[in-house]
Amino acid sequence: MRIRHVVFCLLALVYGAETSDDDLDERTNIFIRDKLIPALKLAEVTKVNFTRLHLCHCSREVGCNARTTGWVPGIEFLNETDRSFYENTCYTDGSCYQSARPSPEISHFGCMDEKSVTDETEFHDTAAKVCTNNTKDPHATVWICCDKGNFCANETIIHLAPGPQQSSTWLILTILALLTFIVLLGIAIFLTRKSWEAKFDWYIRFKPKPGDPLRETENNVPMVTMGDGAGSSVPEVAPIEQQGSTMSTSAGNSFPPGIMPNNMKDMLDVLEETSGSGMGPTTLHKLTIGGQIRLTGRVGSGRFGNVSRGDYRGEAVAVKVFNALDEPAFHKETEIFETRMLRHPNVLRYIGSDRVDTGFVTELWLVTEYHPSGSLHDFLLENTVNIETYYNLMRSTASGLAFLHNQIGGSKESNKPAMAHRDIKSKNIMVKNDLTCAIGDLGLSLSKPEDAASDIIANENYKCGTVRYLAPEILNSTMQFTVFESYQCADVYSFSLVMWETLCRCEDGDVLPREAATVIPYIEWTDRDPQDAQMFDVVCTRRLRPTENPLWKDHPEMKHIMEIIKTCWNGNPSARFTSYICRKRMDERQQLLLDKKAKAVAQTAGVTVQDRKILGPQKPKDESPANGAPRIVQKEIDREDEQENWRETAKTPNGHISSNDDSSRPLLG
């Protein structure tokens, strides 16, 4: 019973498969008769024999699309359902073909019309020739062409001979080995590049030149035969007493004077200057400045690197170490120091520069004088100043800035062009031991072109420096960057902020210094590290300026200082003082201050003399002749008491000295 059921199932499967194939073939014939042929006639296709029309499977990867001959979806009069169902199908009155190739095994299908010999692509051209027996060339692929019905080429499975198999493991290992070799070769070339460069340079310098007498000398050396042996010959050797007129080379040859090869002379000259190569006498080379400096510690860092303290021949120096990526900035600042006649007491003194190999990296050193007090920013963090010190600091800074801005004429080798610093701030101003200042960090400075007709200085990327100290015309991009004086006006604005910072740390009478941590321009309205947009809003849109101490308006000196500061930070660049005018104004105020102090001292001395005449000398009541200790003279006591009484009666409620003449007030602080 079970056997009958199994046989029945097998017969049902076979019958179902045959029925399914018959249904598909009949559906295809109905599609050709009722839809495809009418659509082709509507499309006015006349080169096809409609009585032999059948369908074939076509491969999309070789062009089964609108370019393929007889592509069914390319017929515009068919509906979308038929186009989608017959997407990978073509029609033909000729042959269906299948091609297969090994390694990797790929099969392609398509149509070839009876009257067509070629197609648009090379593949179809080959198929047309194969199916029409028009080629005798051997092919690496296997072809099948048939015309017995719909999709006839799909019925045959092409069995290809197995090709040579390559292990993927060996392929991966081969690739890895090749990559490893390339990497090692690159590392070896990188590590030995200096040696190869030196050898190449040696070859270029000492390669034999055409017409070199070396070969002629070798060819013209007389030969003598030693013994009876044939071919045993050596050059004739001159007597010892005649060898004084020859020069011996490292190769053992001798050449009479005047005919030594030029390249040999060059080689001997180089060998005589060797520093220990083993091919000549050892000579000592002078150490560069980098080899004579001993670094003792880092003192700060900046935009292009860090600053260290060093010892150079017993003198303390500052060494600015540039990063390797900032070599253009190093060369620019070095070139400015070396070629611009920048010897001025209020400009940081340049000592030298060098390239130092530390064994790991190559460092770029710029050596300047060292000031233990550090920058003005650091100095104000630790100290307060009085009016005298304020004038010393700011007047010297203005003097250095005026020196940079002014042009000094001279010969071509000894003239200084007008310059703009472009990064004036308290961190770039050094405080010297005499409480004067020196301007440093000239890496962003700009020189006026020597050609007067060329008035362009920099490109449009002129917004450089510290954002907090940028002038309004730079923040709002209205600066005339082709006019050199515009950069100097921007320097004056930055200098006014430095003057304000220093004034905030000034202490005199009732005027107390501001907290050091808050002495930062615009800190009330900006972050510690503001962006361009934030500074633009504060300085240009809202037109704010750093806040003033209300007591400054009543101070005899600070009110004049604020007048200078307000003029220098004016929003209109043309309304600002020049750096030279700033220096002149502070010179005048400082001189008036010194005159007041001298006049006050003179008046005090005059009062003491007058009192001495009126009171006369008096003996102290406790005078004891028997006492051997030095006696105190009564007139000295009276002088001190009178000075103290004068000071007490002269003080006003605000702590200032009162007088009808302001110039009689002594210097406070």
Swiss-Prot record:
Cytoplasmic face residues: 192-669
Signal sequence coordinates: 1-19
InterPro entries: GS_dom (IPR003605), Kinase-like_dom_sf (IPR011009), Prot_kinase_dom (IPR000719), Protein_kinase_ATP_BS (IPR017441), Ser-Thr/Tyr_kinase_cat_dom (IPR001245), Ser/Thr_kinase_AS (IPR008271), TGFB_receptor (IPR000333)
Effect of residue 400 to E: In ky803; reduces expression of the G protein-coupled receptor (GPCR) srsx-3 in the AWC neuron
Transmembrane segments: 171-191
The protein's name: Cell surface receptor daf-1
Residue intervals annotated with topology Extracellular: 20-170
Active site (UniProt): 423 (proton acceptor)
Gene: daf-1
Domain GS stretches: 262-292
Membrane topology: Single-pass type I membrane protein
Superkingdom of origin: Eukaryota
Keyword ATP-binding annotated: yes
